[in-house]
Amino acid sequence: MRKNRTYSLLVAGSLLLFIGGLFCLPGEITVSNNVYGKELPIQSVETEEKKAVLTFECAWDHSSLKDILEILEDHNVRAAFFVTGDWVKQYPEDVRRIVQGGHDIGNHSATHRNMVQLEKEEIEKELKETHQAVKELTGKEIKFFRPPYGAFNDTVILTAKEGGYLTVMGNIDSMDWKDYGAKTILRTVMEDKELQEGSIIRLNSEAKYTKEALPKLIESLEREGFRLVPLSQLLYQEAYHLDVKGRQIPDDR
């Protein structure tokens, strides 16, 4: 009896391994943000080209946005703007200008709440509200998510993933929100030891000195050989994994 039971267990185990193998065939698309059992956001991207991305968070004010968009246009640079649902509702024309300028739009939640403090259903609601608001205005589907305050845990990232989002933070923080001045913003970014191919640079559209620092920041990055591209042209949408620093690496490397 015990022998038959052992045999049955072995057969069942082999069958499970076989079925599992069907879903892990070589060449299958895989996407993993899990590193040593913890879900991580994308911080930067492994790339042979010297590319980087400027990303802006839009949650409160919009007074500098027009100037920022003009500066980007003057320098022929496309960036990414992470917007909250409240901001979208308050400044719909700015959302349209962002999209018309060829920039990427990202989800920054609906109300800029700390996602870690929310239940899964509340996180889903925050994401859906912003997604729907942007889609109704522009017809665009959002693919990227940045949690407010840089606060995340496994639930936040997995919930975003279930909604079709890549969670993106950034390995270079300009600290422009501290309002120390344009020169400090420039120095903070350009002297960061993590600045490299595939860097994602974080800025705030409403910070006091961001628009003043932006022209010199773009020129300094380009002088160092960086090509500034939209987020959608840098990130891998599939077949990738992350290292311990959140660097996105294609599975064939």
Segments from the language model and where they lie:
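Structural recognition of the beta-strand scaffold that forms the well-ordered cores
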Residues: V53-T55, A79-V83, D104-N107, K143-R146, ...
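C-terminal domain-boundary segment and adjacent tail
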Residues: P26-E28, Y36-E48, D74-N76, W87-K89, ...
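Active-site beta->alpha N-cap acidic-glycine motif
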Residues: T30-N114, L118, E122-E126, H131-A133, ...
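Alpha-helical scaffold elements lining the catalytic groove of polysaccharide deacetylases
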Residues: H62-S64, R113-E141, A151-E197, T210-A213
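Short low-complexity, flexible loop/linker segments enriched in glycine and/or proline
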Residues: V95-R97, E121-I123, K183-L186, L242-R247
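Active-site beta-loop-alpha junctions enriched in small/polar residues
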Residues: A59, T84-D86, A110, G150, ...
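N-terminal Lys/Arg-rich, disordered targeting/topogenic segments
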Residues: M1-T6
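Hydrophobic membrane-insertion alpha-helices, especially the h-region
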Residues: S8-L25
